[in-house]
Each structure stands twice: as structure tokens, then as C-alpha cells.
């Protein structure tokens, strides 16, 4: 079975590299995290021109009588030249991802002091710039920026920061969820409890963490502990993750002020990561087997029963030369085969400004040097080498999936494009889905879905952020600090933008309108993604952590030229607040503010710790914020936008060729205390009657409900448990009961974390008082023993 759906997804980071990116203030995640987090930061939606492709692989039973499902997933946003290959080839991942990933901003949060917001930003002490191993400081100094952590349990995800209070670390969520997140030690790991009392342990020791840039970047899921103390354990192995192409950079080395040479550097993308080796659960085990020659490429997944009997083997065939998954065979389902665009990456330099392949033979990175700099002598090398080529951008992209039934789905792509509002230039970044063709062998028919993008099908979207050539420069190094001449300066040009790095290659273009054409007609959806800062006075650099993706505001379904169905959406923003911070950047292209250094060389350099090497003016004489005075630093107040963003109302009008439409309106109400709890729905129709459904939670209480039970449910993080429901019909000013339900929960021997339903009561219009319908008893650790109905009969 193959499932296509528009889901809340993720974007990936530019791949981690040892050399040119080693001194960035923004850290890099590992290759597998990069692939997994693509779904976090490049949301799968029509508004981004993507479709999510999921193939169910297997499920394992859990002690709480549910299942954990694992899926093979492909992200259709395009393959960049420097993308990590992962364990199955370009574009493919196995979800869920089973890890927490840190995005480091500034310095590592657990090893430095938080810079106060009221700090005198015109004078910075040397301690702010202290580096981990400097001889001058015993500490790392201050840090004004928050590292952001991204977590995925089996069915929930969120992002959070850590804060230090009284030498203890606590987690603060950016988007509120029922998850309870606890920091283990000095961010050695995390304990996460979901709203059913299930505990997830991430990290904790070196076997379950991956360290880069002097801090823990990845925390692997170690175990899931259920309320009856049974566990599911995960075991990993460390392997080298590669790509078929090395990352490239140019170094412009000045030997004198007028003489320089270009050194091109190949940086093989070879980095360790942890790959899943086995999963042990109470009723069996899952093992992951990898190729002998490419130990990071997955070959088989084997599922065993509790008697070690092999139940089934899922086989993957990957072309290890092209790094493309060819097929997967799943017992009980059959074989899925995959076909790709035949264009491959022949020249690593052949990348556009966003890392997509251009196919050009003699391409270099030199052409993107800004022409208004001292390096204008390099203009002789500037060409059009990094402009995008639509056909080449499709290199290695998935084009067809053949089902076990003989049916197939094929994909056609086109370039993502938007108009830069600053200079009206056209920005091209990545691919969008143009057409999807679905063939069904049972009726020998092919159904096509075609997509048109932009307002009134203009073909152009909107930019999330403005691109800049300067984002492709990284730090300069000076070998002789006593020499104030040009000697020893090194400029580096990297292959991918630091904005791609900063936002983990998040999507640059989104569409406010998308039309889907099918043989039955068309559907037009409108989206919004304009963030209203609300007068906070801070630049909210991380608002997308809360809003996550463009959200639908309008949907029309057409039959011919006539609208058959029209739905409008309204949203709530609740408990909006800001996690404040201070972002500090060195403006130094040269390690000095000496007047003999030309002012025009003093460009922003996206690097803070360079100041700790070059010793800028810090003893009260520093100038900041005035580019005409050769400033050493630029200081920006910023905020991480937090709260909860949810659907508030949905109104649908059904025309059905009638002059007066039939209207259905649904309003969604939420708790004032726990914003993620929906307390009610109000459904209204144009006929006049309304249905109000009210949900009660432990924090709300309910007349006649034992308060001790409510307190226990809240204490055990079971705050989303519905204890009672009432449904009422509203006709004008009259209200009448339709039905009601009340469930009494209690603890049972052997399981003092979870609460179990022991009695259920019902009422309705004819029986307005609650009447017990059934009663349950349990064996120790939660297995149902008996259920007795209202008639006294037990099973």
C-alpha cells in the first residue's frame, strides 16, 4: 500500500563538514539527522510544492496494546549535490526518527552564562568572546543565543530550549504540547513523558549521543518505558556516512596586499553517525542488517517473535554506485520498484546558489563573489556558472514507483520560483511537483493530477527570507597576529549558503495559492504564512518554529467553472510570548579597526568567535551598530516566538448547483490552562440548529467526579485524558441534552503510573441522570480481567 498525503514535515540541514564549516557559529547536525530533519523544516504540503510518499514497512506491538509503525518515506523537494546519502540512498528515510537533535546558536548553552537583555551592548568584555580552550578565560563567557532542540516521540514532535536556574536545567517548549521534558544532568540526556504516562529516554551516555563542535548534537532514543515497567530498547552502531561527492570550497590566500592565489579544496564528506542495529520489545526483536562493503547501507530488516523464530524479512536493494534505492520487498505486500531521473552528479562544482545540480562542465564557485569588494579583480572569473538549470536540478530525483500490483505512480517536476521584492529578480530554489500520474491495472486507467502555483496561477511564490551572496563567505584566518598587513589572510567561498545552514536548508519559497486539476475538476487552496510580530520590539528569527509551515485559509472545489464546495479556515494564537535573546556578530573582515584599513572592507562575516582570535577593540572603545565608523560588532535583539497556533473555526458551504448554499460551521474551543486540550466543538448549520459537544479534563473537573482522581491524572501527566463528555442541541435560546458520558479512572496493582478506566456511566435525553453501564477489573500490570455490563453479565 502506498500512501500520498500532505503532512506536517521537516527540512534538513546542509551536511556536516569538517573543514570549511568548522568555525561557524551555527553547528551542523549529523548526516542521518539531516535526512530526518528534512521533514521538520521542509514541510510536506501543496504550499511548498511537495508530496509525501510513505510505504508501510512493519509494526511492533507495545505493552499498552498499541503499535509502533515504521514507514519508508521519500521527500520530493529535490536532491542537492552535497546531500547525505543516508542508509537507503538519496531522498529516503525510515520514520520515526528516534532522536533529539540540537541546533547550536552561538555557544553551547550548558557551558556559558546567559547574556542579560539589559546588558550594555556598547561595551562587551573579553569574556563574552572567550573560546573553550583559550588561555585567557577559564569559562566560555556569555552567550546571548539559545540552542534549539528538536524532539520526536512516536507520535508527537516539538522544539524546546534549555534554561539554567539554581544550577538546574529545565526545558521550555516553543510550541506547547502535553509532553513533559526533563533534562538529565548537564544536558547529558532527556527524559520525556507523554500524555499516556509512557517515558522516552534519550541519550544519557556516550553510546546514545553523538558529539560534534564540543557538545552533544544528537541524543538517540535509548528506551521506551511503559507504565507496567516493560521496555522497548534500541541499540545502535557507529558507522561512517558518506556521499558520492566531496564538498568543495575555494580559498583566496593573500601573500601580499596585491598578490593572491586561489586554492581549491576538496573536503570529503565523511562523518560518523549512529545507525540502528536492533530493537528489542517484550514479544520479540527487530534486527537491521547492512551491506558488507558499505556498512551504512541497509540491506535487510528482520522481525523475530518471542521464541526467536523469524517472522519476516524486508529486503532493500540499493545501487551503491549511484546511491539510489532500487526496490524494497515486503512479505505480505510484495515488491515496490523505484525509477529515477537518469542525470547524475558528474561535476561537484556544478551547483546553483542553493546546492542543486546545474550540469555545467567548467563551473566554479568564484562567480558568486560580490563585485563591490576588494576582490573585484576576480571578476575575470565571474560567469553564469551558478545559475539554476531546471532540467539538471532534477538529477537523481524519484520519477516512478511501481506497485506490487503492477500499477504505478509517476512524478513530473518543475522549478520553484519567486520574485525578489527588493530588485524584482527571479529566485529559483529547488523543485515542485508539476504532475502526478496514477495508473491502476484493474481498470487499465491512468488518472493525472496537475498543479498550478501562485496567485491566479502566476507560477511565482513568496520568499521566506531574502537570499544574499554574502551568505556564501565563511571566516578568514590569520596566521601571524602580530602582522597587520594583508599577509596571511584567507577568504573562503563555500558551496552552500549559510542561510541554508542556519535554517537547515529549510524551504526558501512557499505558495499562497495552489490549484490541483483532476478529470473531475479542480481544487484551489489558499495559504498564509505572514507573521505578525505584534509590536514586541524584537525580530523573531525563529517564528517558523511555532507556525511550522504555511497554513490553509481557503479551499474551493470546482465542477467545471462552478464552485461546488467552499471552506474557510480561521486560527487561534494563544499564550503568545517571546523567548528573548541577543545575537552578536563580528563585522570584521580584517582583524582590526585601524583607520588604514579601508572602510568598505568592513563587511558582516557571520562569525562571532573570530573576535576571540583577532582581539578587536574591547576595552571600552568599541563602536557598535554604526557601519560608517568601522564597528567591531552588530548586536540584534531577537525573539523565539512561542505559544500555540491552532484551528479555531471552519466554515463550509455546499452549493450542489443550488442558488442558496447549505452551510456548516464548526468552531473549536480550547482550555485556558492547557492550550492543547480541545474543550468543545460547536457545529452549526444554515437550517438553524446547533450541536455543542463539551469535553472535560482533569484540570477542569466535573460535577460529582472524584477530585482525588483528577489530581492523580494531572500528577501523572495524563492531562489530556477526557473524563466526561456532554452533547447538547441548541435551538434558538433552548438547549436540550442529547447524551453524556463519564469515565472513572483508577490505579491498579503493578502499574502506578498509568490510570485505567474502571467504571463508565451514560445519560441521554430520556435518562438525564448518569447510569452505570459497565465496570472493569484488571490483572496486575494492566491486562483486562473482566468487564461487567449493566445487566450484571461479566465477560
Question: Positions of the model-derived regions?
Answer:
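Outer-membrane beta-barrel pore domains and translocons
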Residues: 73-75, 237-239, 416, 698
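Glycine-centered tight beta-turn/hairpin loop motif at sheet-sheet or coil-to-beta transitions
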Residues: 63-65, 155-157, 176-178, 193-197, ...
